[in-house]
Design a protein with these regions (language model features):
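Amphipathic, well-ordered alpha-helical segments in soluble domains
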Residues: 7, 11, 34-41, 76, ...
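Short, hydrophobic/aliphatic alpha-helical segments
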Residues: 3-22, 138-141
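A structural-propensity feature for long, helix-poor, extended segments
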Residues: 50-89
Length: 151
């Protein structure tokens, strides 16, 4: 399933299915993307707004950072599913001979590393959203304060 082009309904249905992907990593990445999108929305709705002239540069920077994180998080949602599938492929490798066992073990170890790196990246960009949300909630358009807080 291409998580980036599926509908929200299909994405959620796929998550609820008997299939192992999308799983927790993809959901965490999607949550990060929506948080960044909310911060970005606050910035976009603060631009050129009367009373917010002194934070225009900060909102521009917020918008750029949030857009970057949003796009990165979306790519990580798909990456999480991809690395999990590669891990499952490694587990399915033959293990009849000593050579096959060594190759399988090496593939599994590499797949573990790859599979661990994606959630680590998701966590790192999710942490960055706290700063964006703080700026959005405290300096952005106050009609959108709840969106900034939820981000």
């Amino acid at each position: 399933m291409d998580l980036l082009t599926s509908s929200v309904k299909d994405f959620v249905a796929a998550t609820a299915s008997k299939e192992p992907t999308p799983g927790g990593g993809a959901i965490a990445a999607l949550t990060a993307a929506t948080g960044a999108a909310l911060a970005e929305m606050v910035a976009n709705l603060t631009f050129d707004k009367k009373g917010y002239e002194d934070v225009q540069e900060e909102m521009h920077l917020l918008q750029q950072k949030a857009e970057f994180i949003r796009e990165k998080a979306l790519s990580l949602a798909q990456a999480d599913a991809n690395v999990f599938n590669l891990f499952m492929d490694a587990l399915a490798l033959p293990k009849n001979t000593d050579e096959e066992k060594l190759a399988r073990t090496a593939a599994i170890q590499q797949a573990y590393k790859d599979a661990a790196n994606v959630p680590l990246e998701i966590g790192m960009i999710s942490y960055e959203i706290f700063d964006l949300a703080y700026v959005a909630a405290t300096k952005g358009n106050q009609n959108l304060i709840t969106d900034g807080i939820i981000a």
